Every structure is written in structure tokens, then in C-alpha cells.
């Protein structure tokens, strides 16, 4: 007589995996259907272009944040760093000290869009380097270092600008925020190219494998020869770089750099990454999910605005979705027995 063989509930496990992998995409499609049904302007070309541009700016920072969260880190300074890099870019583009620039100053003055772009990404990368070194050399938790960075960069922005905006950029610079290549907005092309590059780096390079290894188990990675501290510094430089790039695109789109730019972006960016399936505990996730997460947040906010939902309620909704995404990730881990 043969004894019955216990089988693992494969169907149920596969259902959980499918839900984790495709859940955000299904939710995004459902949201689009709901908003298309509730507001006739949602699917208009003008609205879709605006949503795509906003998603691209948030998504650029989220790409960098993906690297950080994959190492089980966090960066709360990205919103303030966005404002700081944008202000630096504006000053370089216009030429001169912030307090000498006015809203009516000539758009043709300054050092041009390329110098502004270079300044933004260099400042962002340098900020990431400083924060990464503070985390690895001083052994201060990322939460504390970047929370301090949030305040420091905002203060530097206000000091640099005197609290006022700088606007009136050249058509060449504005093209990066409002231009089209064929039917596609330029920010979408920049975001798409960056997403492809980040995916290749994470999936097909030694550095990418090291990022996952550090997030999975930093001590085991160290024992296997991974230079953990260098990886950690590098990922904070990456998110700093993308914060600078996003700042340049945002300033170009708005034709203005403001000291209050980026407030609340840290929550939006982290939400996009986590909703896309990257675990806050590190080692799990990827670029594809982040792109979907950024799109989901962008569509959600846009749809709520079109349906006259207040900005305060929008923040509540995003916060609840973030909590739900983290709780769901934890539940899946427990379900899988990890």
C-alpha cells in the first residue's frame, strides 16, 4: 500500500507570484479605465502628454531610488535635492547670482542649457557622494543621514534663491521639458532611455549583481568579496545623479526653478518604487516594476485632480497605498516562508 504524497499548493503559490508580478500593472490598467469613464478629458492628448511628462520626472528619481532600496537603504532627501539642483541649474542657465535675477530678466543671458544640465547632475551626484560617505564611513543609518539632507538641501536652496523663483530660460533649455520628438514628449524619451540603461546595469552587469547581493545579505556579500561600502556609496551617487537630471527637466518644463519645488517628492518616489514590487527590505525588485509604479502614481494623482479631489486627500490616498504595498510585500514573504 502506498502512502499519499503531500503536495505543495502549487496553484495557490503561482497565483501569489502572478499577483505580485502583475498586480501593479493590473491596478494601473483598472485605474485608467475608471478615470476614462469618470472624466472625458482623461484620455485627451493634452492630458496624456501632461501625465507622461510628470511621470517621467518622478520616474527618473525613482530609477535612482530603486538602486538605493535594493540595498535596503532609503533616501529621504530627493525632494529637497531636486529643488537645490534645479536652482543651481537655473542660476547657471541665467548667469549670475540668484539675488540679481528677476522674473523679467532676459532669457538669452547665461551659460546655456548644457552648462545648466552639467551643473545639475554634478551637484546631485556630489550630494549623493557626501551622503553615501556619511553612511559608510560614519556608520550613520541612511534614514538619519538623508533626513538631515532633506533639511540641509532645502535650506541651501532657500539661501541660494532668497526664497524666490528664477524663470525665463532659453528655447533650447525649455525643449527638454516641453519639446516633442515626433509624437513623443522629450521627457518621456529621456526617462525611457534611462530606464533601459538602468535595467541593463542591474540585470546584466557585475555591479548590478552586487547591488542585489548587498540588499539580500550585506555580510554574506562582504565575505564573498563584494566591496559593500563602495556599492552603497555608488547607489547614493546614482540617485543623486537622477535627482539632478530630473531637476533640470522639471525646470525646463516649468520654465522656472522654485525654492519650494519637490516638497513631498520623497513619499511619491518611494511609493512608486515599492508599489512596483521592490522590497524595502532589499534584494528584490527591478526597473520594470518601478516604471509601472511611477505610472500608477502619476495616473492616480492626475485622475484624482480631474475628479476634483483635494491635494490633501491625494496625499492620504498615496500614503495608504504605500502602507498597503509594504504590508503586501511582507505578507508574501511570510507566505513563501522566507
Predicted regions located by residue number:
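Membrane-interfacial amphipathic/re-entrant helices at transmembrane-helix boundaries
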Residues: 2-62, 97-115, 226
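Single transmembrane alpha-helix segments in multi-pass membrane proteins
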Residues: 30-99, 133-140, 277-288, 320
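Transmembrane alpha-helical segments in multi-pass inner-membrane proteins
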Residues: 243, 253-319
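Transmembrane helix-bundle core of multi-pass membrane transporters
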Residues: 114, 138, 142-205, 231-234, ...
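Alpha-helical transmembrane segments within multi-pass membrane transporters and channels
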Residues: 97-149, 292-293, 297
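Hydrophobic core segments of alpha-helical transmembrane domains in multi-pass membrane transport
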Residues: 24-37, 65-66, 121-124, 150-155, ...
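Helix-loop-helix "hairpin" substructures at the membrane interface of multi-pass membrane proteins
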Residues: 112-120, 124-131, 183-258
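Cytosolic-side transmembrane-helix boundaries in multi-pass membrane proteins
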Residues: 1-33, 37, 196, 223, ...
Amino acid at each position: 500500500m502506498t502512502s499519499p504524497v503531500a503536495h505543495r499548493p502549487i496553484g495557490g503559490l503561482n497565483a501569489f507570484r502572478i499577483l505580485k508580478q502583475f498586480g501593479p500593472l493590473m491596478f494601473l490598467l483598472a485605474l485608467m479605465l475608471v478615470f476614462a469613464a469618470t472624466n472625458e478629458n482623461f484620455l485627451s492628448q493634452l492630458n496624456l502628454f501632461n501625465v507622461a511628462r510628470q511621470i517621467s520626472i518622478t520616474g527618473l528619481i525613482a530609477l535612482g531610488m530603486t538602486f538605493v532600496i535594493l540595498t535596503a537603504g532609503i533616501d529621504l532627501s530627493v525632494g529637497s535635492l531636486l529643488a537645490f539642483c534645479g536652482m543651481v541649474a537655473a542660476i547657471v542657465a541665467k548667469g549670475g547670482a540668484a539675488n540679481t535675477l528677476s522674473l523679467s530678466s532676459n532669457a538669452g543671458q547665461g551659460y546655456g542649457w548644457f552648462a545648466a544640465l552639467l551643473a545639475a547632475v554634478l551637484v546631485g551626484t556630489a550630494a549623493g557622494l557626501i551622503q553615501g560617505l556619511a553612511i559608510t564611513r560614519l556608520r550613520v543609518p541612511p534614514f538619519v543621514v538623508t533626513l538631515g539632507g532633506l533639511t540641509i538641501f532645502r535650506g541651501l536652496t532657500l539661501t541660494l534663491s532668497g526664497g524666490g523663483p528664477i524663470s525665463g530660460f532659453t528655447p533650447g533649455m525649455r525643449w527638454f521639458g516641453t519639446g516633442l520628438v515626433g509624437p513623443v514628449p522629450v521627457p518621456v524619451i529621456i526617462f525611457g532611455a534611462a530606464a533601459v540603461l538602468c535595467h541593463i546595469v542591474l540585470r546584466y552587469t557585475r555591479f548590478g549583481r552586487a547591488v542585489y547581493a548587498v540588499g539580500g545579505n550585506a555580510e554574506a556579500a562582504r565575505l564573498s568579496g563584494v566591496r559593500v561600502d563602495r556599492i552603497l556609496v555608488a547607489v547614493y551617487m546614482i540617485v543623486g545623479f537622477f535627482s539632478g537630471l530630473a531637476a533640470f527637466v522639471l525646470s525646463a518644463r516649468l520654465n522656472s526653478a522654485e525654492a519650494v519645488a519637490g516638497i513631498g517628492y520623497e513619499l511619491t518616489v518611494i511609493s512608486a518604487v515599492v508599489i512596483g514590487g521592490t522590497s524595502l527590505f532589499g534584494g528584490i525588485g527591478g526597473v520594470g516594476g518601478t516604471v509601472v509604479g511611477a505610472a500608477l502614481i502619476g495616473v492616480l494623482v492626475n485622475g484624482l485632480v480631474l475628479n476634483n479631489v483635494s491635494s490633501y486627500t491625494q496625499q492620504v490616498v498615496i500614503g495608504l497605498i504605500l502602507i498597503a504595498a509594504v504590508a503586501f510585500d511582507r505578507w508574501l514573504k511570510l507566505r513563501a516562508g522566507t
